[in-house]
């Protein structure tokens, strides 16, 4: 990890950078085959990603993947496990077709596609879920539905800005430079707040995604949405040939 300067951008325990996502929960958040494929060549999946192609040999990518999958943060006393109450959501496979309807129904309670993009369809306030089934574990996807503030996907943190004329502006922070801060508001609109108009701003620890879907949706609804998300895959990613 140190040799390839991973810690320059990524956090492990309390060490490392904050440019990229924390890797403390890699085994819970990501599928091993996705970690291997992403580490090997991230531009294959996101051409505009800031993560460079490290030029890793297959055995190096495998070694880093194995390390991340087995890594346990020092402050954690137990391995990441699904809470007992999650079993009711994870005990069956669910109906992906029904889950797709729930996800994309603009009149439904969930209306997930208002904020999330799937294969060019939906909003951009939240993360693109077009290949969620390839990259994310089922447990992580469930956690993101039931308690979205536990892990806020890197690049989708909410920022609250107080302007010098005492106006509060909230949105997803997309960029910050000398000219100001670019955000996406709750309706998907792009806003640029000039630096000279900003008094102060703070990154919020609460996700913009509602945290009460456990109360709003039936267990079967959540299970079916999970099945739909799990079906959103890229062509098979394997490391069997490496």
Residue ranges and their predicted role:
Residues 2-22, 44-45, 70-77, 101-128, ...:
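Periplasmic/extracellular electron-transfer cofactor-ligation site
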Residues 8-40, 50-53, 119-146, 157-203:
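Gly/Gly-Pro-rich "capping" loops immediately C-terminal to redox-active cysteine motifs
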Residues 16, 20, 48, 83-84, ...:
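Residue-level signal for cytosolic alpha-helical hairpin/rod architecture
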Residues 200-224:
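Intrinsically disordered, low-complexity linker and terminal regions at domain boundaries
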């Amino acid at each position: 990890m140190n040799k390839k300067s991973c810690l320059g951008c990524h956090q492990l325990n309390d060490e490392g950078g904050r440019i990229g996502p924390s890797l403390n929960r890699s085994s819970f958040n990501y599928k091993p085959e996705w970690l291997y494929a992403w580490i090997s060549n991230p531009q294959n999946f996101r051409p505009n990603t800031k993560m460079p192609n490290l030029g890793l040999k297959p055995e190096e990518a495998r070694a880093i993947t194995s390390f991340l999958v087995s890594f346990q943060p020092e402050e954690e006393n137990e391995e990441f496990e699904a809470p007992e109450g999650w079993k009711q959501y994870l005990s069956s496979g669910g109906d992906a077709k029904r889950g797709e309807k729930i996800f994309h129904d603009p009149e439904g309670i969930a209306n997930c596609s208002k904020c999330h993009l799937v294969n060019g369809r939906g909003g951009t306030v939240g993360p693109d879920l077009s290949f969620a089934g390839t990259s994310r574990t089922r447990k992580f996807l469930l956690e993101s539905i039931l308690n979205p503030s536990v892990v806020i996907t890197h690049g989708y943190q909410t920022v609250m800005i107080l302007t010098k004329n005492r106006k509060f502006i909230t949105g997803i922070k997309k960029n910050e430079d000398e000219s100001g801060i670019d955000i996406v508001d709750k309706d998907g609109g792009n806003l640029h707040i000039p630096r000279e108009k900003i008094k102060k701003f703070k990154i919020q620890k609460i996700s913009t995604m509602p945290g009460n879907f456990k109360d709003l949706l039936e267990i079967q609804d959540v299970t079916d949405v999970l099945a739909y998300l799990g079906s959103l895959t890229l062509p098979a990613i394997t490391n069997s040939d490496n």
